[in-house]
Amino acid sequence: RPYACELTVAAGPCLRFSAFYYSKGANQCYPFNYSGCGGNANRFSTNQKCRRTCVV
C-alpha cells in the first residue's frame, strides 16, 4: 500500500468539502469533511479511488 494509506485522517483548518480517508485498522474507506488546506495524503476525492488505492 502507498504511504498515504498509513496516515491518520487530517481535516485541515479551512473551508470544508467531502472527501474520503482510509482507516488502516478497519481496512475501509470513510467519508470526512476536508477543509481544503493542510491535512495529509490520506485524502481521496471518491470512495472508489480510496478503495482502489488502499483496501487490501
UniProtKB/Swiss-Prot annotation:
Belongs to the venom Kunitz-type family. Keywords: Disulfide bond, G-protein coupled receptor impairing toxin, Secreted, Toxin. GO terms for molecular function: serine-type endopeptidase inhibitor activity; toxin activity. Interacts with vasopressin V2 receptor (V2R/AVPR2), probably in a selective manner. Inhibits vasopressin binding human V2R in the nanomolar range (Ki=45.1 nM), and also potently inhibits vasopressin-induced cAMP production (IC(50)=111 nM). In vivo, intraperitoneal injection of this protein into rats increases diuresis, without any loss of electrolytes. Coiled coil: none annotated. PANTHER family: BPTI_KUNITZ INHIBITOR DOMAIN-CONTAINING PROTEIN (PTHR10083:SF374), KUNITZ-TYPE PROTEASE INHIBITOR-RELATED (PTHR10083). This is Mambaquaretin-9. It holds the Pfam family Kunitz_BPTI. Expressed by the venom gland. Exploits its two major loops and engages more positions in its interaction with V2R. The pharmacophore defined by numerous amino acids positioned in loop 1 (9 to 17) and loop 2 (33, 38 and 43) may be at the origin of the absolute selectivity of this protein for V2R. Disulfide bonds join C5-C54, C14-C37, C29-C50. It comes from Dendroaspis viridis (Western green mamba). It is found in: Secreted. Gene3D superfamilies: Pancreatic trypsin inhibitor Kunitz domain. GO terms for cellular component: extracellular space. InterPro entries: Kunitz_BPTI, Kunitz_BPTI_sf, Prtase_inh_Kunz-CS, TFPI/VKTCI-like. The keyword Disulfide bond applies. Residues 5-56 form the BPTI/Kunitz inhibitor domain.
